Amino acid sequence: MGDVHESISEQMADWMAAQPMFFVGSAPLSGDGRVNISPKGMAGTFAVLGPRRVAYLDYTGSGAETIAHLRENGRIVVMFCAFEGAPNIVRLHGRGRIVLPGDESFDQLRASFPKERTLGQRSIIDVDVQRISDSCGYAVPLMDFTADRVVLDRSAERRDEEYFERYGQEQNATSIDGLPALPPR
C-alpha cells in the first residue's frame, strides 16, 4: 500500500538523487492524443528545489512531447524506481512549466544543477508538485547500474549552438500529435 506525503523529505530527496534514472509522463488533452513517457538520466540533471518543487535539465532529443504537453495543459508526473537496494517507487504529480535559455529565471534555475555541459540544453522543466506518493515497487526488477551513457555528451561536443537552434526548429517545433512544442526564437 502506498503513502501520500505532504512534502519531499530530506530522506526522499537524497534517495531520488541517488537513482541513476527517472521517468517523466505527460499527455495531451485530446482523448486520441498520445501519452508520452520519457526516461531521463545523466547525473546532475535533477534537482529538488523545495518541499513541493523539483526541476530537471532537459537536453535536445528526438522529440519534444513533454514540452508540447506542458505548453498545452501543464500536467506532468515524475517517477523514480529503485533498481538496486530496497524496493521503492516515488511519484511526483504536478504542474510543470518550461523555462527556456534566455528566459528571465533560466540562469538562476540552471545554477541548481551540477551537470556542467550547457551545449544542447533545450530547457529546464520546473514542476510545482501537487501530490507526492511512494509505493512498494516489489515487481520492479533488480538491475546493476554500470555507468551513465556518454553518447549524448560526445554528440554535443561535435556540434555548435547553430546546430541545436536549427534542430530545435526543424525537429522539435511540434509534438507527434502536431501540438506546438519549442517556440520560434
Predicted segments with their positions:
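Binding-site signature for planar aromatic cofactors or substrates
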Residues: M1-R185
